[in-house]
Amino acid sequence: MTLLALGINHKTAPVSLRERVSFSPDKLDQALDSLLAQPMVQGGVVLSTCNRTELYLSVEEQDNLQEALIRWLCDYHNLNEEDLRKSLYWHQDNDAVSHLMRVASGLDSLVLGEPQILGQVKKAFADSQKGHMKASELERMFQKSFSVAKRVRTETDIGASAVSVAFAACTLARQIFESLSTVTVLLVGAGETIELVARHLREHKVQKMIIANRTRERAQILADEVGAEVIALSEIDERLREADIIISSTASPLPIIGKGMVERALKSRRNQPMLLVDIAVPRDVEPEVGKLANAYLYSVDDLQSIISHNLAQRKAAAVEAETIVAQETSEFMAWLRAQSASETIREYRSQAEQVRDELTAKALAALEQGGDAQAIMQDLAWKLTNRLIHAPTKSLQQAARDGDNERLNILRDSLGLE
């Protein structure tokens, strides 16, 4: 049995290839069935995200194994083999285990240390459990990767610092406000960055969010997801006083929030502080707002400096994480090697028990016929000893005849002889 990890990711393949190799969720069961129908495949998990498509497999060794699996992948997606081979990576046993642990821990992600990948790996594993997982070693490898990812998050600072604009904006808000559960947040825009911000805020228990956007329909989709209220851009002036935090990211060529608007809001708030995070380019908030007392304005450049600092911290944490992965990989491979001996141990024990049962039955039969108990017990002990040492004795004799001292020493060690 061999463990494999093969696939492509954002480092090896452009999006034009990644989208062709991806597995759609509605056809994943069909793909897994097709994969497990391959004679060499004992178990499989398919991980397919926007940044990677990977197959994790337990397989029987055979000639042309790599070619057979690449051919299946190309046939399934109707791809040219040469196009795929240039971007494909292939990891086996120790390297496959290490790769999965690194992926689950966020060490192989586009954004170093990002936590979302662990959920994606867990989902891929759960999908494979629906009648597709047949290899206990593969299952154990995934379970181990989950515990390693948790250990990496617990013992290092890999996820402690914001390295995306959206996450940095939320981190800044959490640093300034003791609790986000009691604040009101105004989000201006409804694009991808604001979507991420809204989800981060929801995770941190923000109860009241207002989304202001040019088109109500797009904003409403996000609002329904995070439980927010939707208003028009024209209503910002009137509603601004309600907001403790304003995070803005639109494509407007001109500022949406001016100094006068913020002055009026602060006056209505009796100068309770406001945090304004402007992550738009061009800027959505007039720079003069930052000069107002109790208005704390941060631009995208301010966030980038935070991100750069935090990325350096994550890279340092990643070094610690790699050490954990190396240690855990070594321990898992030791367990795997021990498993390979378990079948031999079971067979050896079964053979010994069969000999014991056979000779014990004969001894009991002799006792029932009135035979001498002491003689029967001595005969049982003698025969049992001879039967159990017969095969090891022959192996020792053969090793001695062959002059194979290494094998002789291994046999002596196995038999507990000094």
Swiss-Prot record:
Pathway: Porphyrin-containing compound metabolism; protoporphyrin-IX biosynthesis; 5-aminolevulinate from L-glutamyl-tRNA(Glu): step 1/2
UniProt-listed Gene3D superfamilies: Glutamyl-tRNA reductase, N-terminal domain, NAD(P)-binding Rossmann-like Domain
UniProt-listed GO biological process terms: protoporphyrinogen IX biosynthetic process from glutamate
GO MF annotation list: glutamyl-tRNA reductase activity; NADP binding
Entry EC no(s): 1.2.1.70
The keyword Oxidoreductase belongs to this UniProt entry's keyword annotation: yes
Pfam families according to UniProt: GlutR_dimer (PF00745), GlutR_N (PF05201), Shikimate_DH (PF01488)
Record-annotated site: Important for activity: H99
Residues binding NADP(+): G189, A190, G191, E192, T193, I194
Active site: C50
CDD domains in alphabetical order: NAD_bind_Glutamyl_tRNA_reduct
PANTHER family per record: GLUTAMYL-TRNA REDUCTASE
Subunit structure: Homodimer.
Family statement: Belongs to the glutamyl-tRNA reductase family.
Domain-related comment: Possesses an unusual extended V-shaped dimeric structure with each monomer consisting of three distinct domains arranged along a curved 'spinal' alpha-helix. The N-terminal catalytic domain specifically recognizes the glutamate moiety of the substrate. The second domain is the NADPH-binding domain, and the third C-terminal domain is responsible for dimerization.
Protein name per the record: Glutamyl-tRNA reductase
UniProt organism field: Escherichia coli O9:H4 (strain HS)
